[in-house]
């Protein structure tokens, strides 16, 4: 399963299992060590972002790995990164892509995403502009009309700096608006997906429109469901599926995502987990159906940065 790929609407192949590089602790060297381990294990898809502030460590790990593994070429790797909210002005989109290339020490990016469907203002030093309340100052015009941002994304493809473009955290209404103006359709929509947030309607919409879903937080979250105190990892049905299969709960949840047909992006800084998360079994129909029953009717989102942004992408969930 680890070598499984999907085909993007560009015709490019994308590895179905990617390694998430968001560093929880952010300690210097943590990302370098984790990415090095991931590449050694066999991951060939790295999911990065300008906002993670560790692209330089990812780039160092990639450079050093390729130097000691002449059998692996840059084109064997699939590197994704993302533009942050305050860099949605066309000239900033292009700056962000070039800056990420420099930090990642690559000549091109395989997949470049608009990280959130929210445009924010920036300071003169290209830092995020904050209001008196400490929250982002929203650029309403670019948030409501993403066309200038998307045109800049398309121009990056035309220039060759970026091979494919897509979005992250976009809703069905947002995607519908984008598809109406896009000359180059988004190749992916990276969203939170796990058994407590199966996102059936959005996943189906993406597939119907030739957009490949990618699951971040595919293992759920360390957080509890606010209303019940339940954690994904403590769900008895999910634990039972893992126990009878002989695999870890993480492996089972990743297998569920692959069987649903989308990319999964596990992240870890623990070497043993980095390895086990790459060795994903084929899920039996019985086990798949058991997880589907857990997911049925659930809609618990763990990742919502509304308190940071001062803007809620999902107001209907309030």
Curated annotation (Swiss-Prot):
Pfam families: Aldo_ket_red (PF00248)
GO MF entries: glycerol 2-dehydrogenase (NADP+) activity
PROSITE patterns: ALDOKETO_REDUCTASE_1 (PS00798), ALDOKETO_REDUCTASE_3 (PS00063)
E.C. numbers: 1.1.1.156
Active site feature: 52 (proton donor)
Classification via InterPro entries: AKR, Aldo/ket_reductase_CS, NADP_OxRdtase_dom, NADP_OxRdtase_dom_sf
Catalytic reaction(s) noted: glycerol + NADP(+) = dihydroxyacetone + NADPH + H(+)
Binding site residues for substrate: 115
Keyword set, alphabetical order: Glycerol metabolism, NADP, Oxidoreductase
Job description of the protein: Glycerol oxidoreductase probably involved in glycerol synthesis.
Homology family: Belongs to the aldo/keto reductase family.
Name of this protein: Glycerol 2-dehydrogenase (NADP(+))
Organism expressing this protein natively: Hypocrea jecorina
Source species taxonomy: Eukaryota, Fungi, Dikarya, Ascomycota, Pezizomycotina
Gene: gld2
């Amino acid at each position: 399963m680890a070598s499984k790929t999907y085909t993007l609407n560009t015709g490019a192949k994308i590895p179905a299992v990617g390694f998430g590089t968001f560093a929880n602790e952010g300690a210097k060297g943590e990302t370098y060590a984790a990415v090095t381990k991931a590449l050694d294990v066999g991951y060939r898809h790295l999911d990065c972002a300008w906002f993670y502030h560790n692209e330089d460590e990812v780039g160092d790990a990639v450079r050093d790995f390729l130097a000691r593994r002449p059998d692996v070429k840059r084109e064997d790797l699939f590197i994704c990164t993302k533009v942050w909210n305050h860099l949605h002005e066309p000239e900033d989109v292009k700056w962000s892509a070039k800056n990420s290339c420099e930090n990642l020490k690559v000549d091109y990016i395989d997949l470049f995403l608009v990280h959130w469907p929210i445009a924010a203002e920036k300071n003169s030093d290209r830092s995020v502009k904050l209001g008196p309340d400490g929250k982002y100052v929203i650029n309403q015009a670019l948030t409501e009309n993403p066309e200038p941002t998307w045109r800049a994304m398309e121009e990056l493809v035309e220039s060759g700096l970026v091979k494919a473009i897509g979005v992250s955290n976009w809703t069905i209404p947002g995607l519908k608006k984008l598809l109406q103006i896009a000359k180059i359709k988004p190749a992916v929509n990276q969203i939170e997906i796990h058994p407590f947030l199966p996102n059936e309607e959005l996943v189906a919409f993406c597939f119907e429109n030739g957009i490949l879903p990618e699951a971040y937080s595919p293992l759920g979250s360390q957080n509890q469901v606010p209303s019940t105190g339940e954690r994904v990892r403590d769900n008895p049905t999910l634990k039972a599926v893992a126990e009878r299969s002989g695999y870890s709960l993480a492996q089972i949840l990743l297998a569920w995502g692959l069987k649903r047909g989308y990319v999964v992006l596990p992240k870890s800084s623990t070497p043993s987990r980095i390895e086990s998360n790459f060795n994903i079994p084929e899920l039996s129909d019985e086990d798949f159906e058991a997880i589907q029953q857990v997911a049925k009717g659930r809609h618990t989102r763990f990742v919502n940065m509304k308190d940071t942004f001062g803007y809620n992408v999902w107001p209907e969930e309030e």
